[in-house]
């Protein structure tokens, strides 16, 4: 099936008892066992079924199947936020003494997790420029558990050469984890370009309406964990916390996502509310239609800003003179690369503040991927915790303004930008 069809139908058919067409909200904490033996079999992973909503939930299961189908994975795990998805993906395979290698240009929350939180838990993160594959490969050693990048960077809008980075990681027996939040599977399916694990903030484009937090981890099922037993003991040796299970033996190709569910999620508990899942499923059904308008509007906004005398620079890989335009064309299927763009106003940070304060239609907030157009100044919000050196590494100059272009009529978006640019002088 095509992506548009999968987004509406994958993972669910009308309920056999009630014939309900909409996915039901299973607002329950727990599930009855048929017998003592049935309960024991569920806990031993001998039979499929539900035990407790922190681990599995029928509403969440539909969303997991649907996103896995859209990405082309063997399985997925829904969690409470995009940050939980990133954290759990790493904790599934990394422990004290391990390291991961990451691009330096990242969403501010991810950078903070990598630069400050994970190191305090004994996991080192090594940063390199997103466009220097050789530098990233040189950082991989015997303790490296993963390479991490964003398919489209937030807020810089940079494009990573996914296939080249995947090849570099695989030469050392290391998986590539890709945050595909900004591109979504409508524009880019990282598994088709060598990635092994995909993470999403469902909060953004997949939910699409700024009403619910959610995250997703998707497993390609292609990485040969069992061939790298020394590098990945957490998947290849008995787990005393779960009846001595060996995940590569019990789950086969789904070993990663299996452990992600029964260890990080079960033990730390960032479970996704089934009510949030219901809202996200509603958004997901129209993802392809919305992304078409998001991208069309963003391309027009970028072209408008590029010719405006009050604008110093524009970063959007959909522009033909952008140095990463060809990469965007390759990995986004020839479509505009999503709807996140950044620019600087002549007059620096003070002019940028006047611009943001003058906006009337475009909302001042730090989310992205909403149906509504949004603007923020990352250096004073999402990346506020970074010092000047870290801001430079993250590709966030102090005059950068990030726009998340919505699905409103383009004339109204441009009119608001025009009057705000005039007010910024």
State what each model feature region is.
Residues 30, 35-87, 109-117:
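Conserved N-terminal alpha-helix of the aminotransferase class I/II PLP-enzyme fold
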């Amino acid at each position: 099936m095509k992506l548009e069809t999968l987004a509406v139908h994958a993972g669910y058919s009308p309920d056999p008892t009630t014939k309900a067409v909409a996915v039901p909200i299973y607002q329950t904490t727990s599930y009855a066992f048929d017998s003592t033996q049935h309960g024991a079999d569920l806990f031993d992973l001998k039979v499929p079924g539900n035990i407790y909503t922190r681990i599995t939930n029928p509403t969440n299961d539909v969303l997991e199947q649907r996103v896995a189908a859209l990405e082309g994975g063997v399985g997925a795990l829904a969690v409470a936020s995009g940050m939980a998805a990133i954290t759990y993906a790493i904790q599934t395979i990394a422990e004290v003494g391990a390291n991961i290698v990451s691009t330096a240009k990242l969403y501010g929350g991810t950078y903070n997790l990598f630069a400050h939180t994970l190191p305090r838990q004994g996991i080192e993160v090594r940063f390199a420029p997103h466009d220097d594959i050789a530098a990233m490969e040189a950082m991989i050693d015997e303790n490296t558990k993963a390479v991490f990048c964003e398919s489209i960077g937030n807020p810089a809008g940079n494009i990573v050469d996914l296939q080249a980075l995947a090849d570099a990681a695989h030469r050392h027996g290391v998986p590539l984890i890709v945050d595909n939040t900004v591109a979504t599977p409508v524009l880019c399916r990282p598994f088709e370009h060598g990635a092994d694990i995909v993470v999403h903030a469902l909060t953004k484009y997949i939910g699409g309406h700024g009403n619910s937090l959610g995250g997703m981890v998707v497993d390609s099922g292609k990485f040969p964990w069992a061939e790298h037993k020394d590098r990945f003991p957490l998947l290849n040796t008995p787990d005393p916390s779960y009846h001595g299970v060996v995940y590569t033996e019990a789950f086969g190709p789904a070993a990663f996502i299996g452990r992600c569910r029964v260890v990080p999620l079960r033990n730390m508990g960032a479970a996704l509310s089934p009510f949030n899942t219901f809202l996200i499923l509603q958004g997901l059904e129209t993802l392809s239609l919305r992304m078409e308008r998001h991208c069309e509007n963003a391309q027009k906004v970028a072209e408008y800003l590029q010719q405006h005398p009050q604008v110093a620079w524009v970063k959007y890989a959909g522009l033909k003179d952008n140095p990463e335009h060809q990469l965007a064309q390759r990995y986004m299927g020839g479509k505009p690369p999503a709807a996140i763009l950044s620019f600087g106003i002549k007059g620096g940070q003070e002019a940028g503040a006047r611009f943001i304060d003058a906006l009337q239609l475009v909302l001042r907030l730090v989310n992205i991927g909403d149906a509504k157009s949004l603007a923020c100044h990352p250096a004073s919000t999402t990346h506020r915790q970074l010092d000047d050196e870290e801001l430079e590494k993250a590709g966030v100059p102090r005059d950068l303004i990030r726009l998340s272009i919505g699905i409103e009529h383009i004339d109204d978006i441009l009119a608001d930008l025009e009057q705000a640019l005039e007010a910024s002088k």
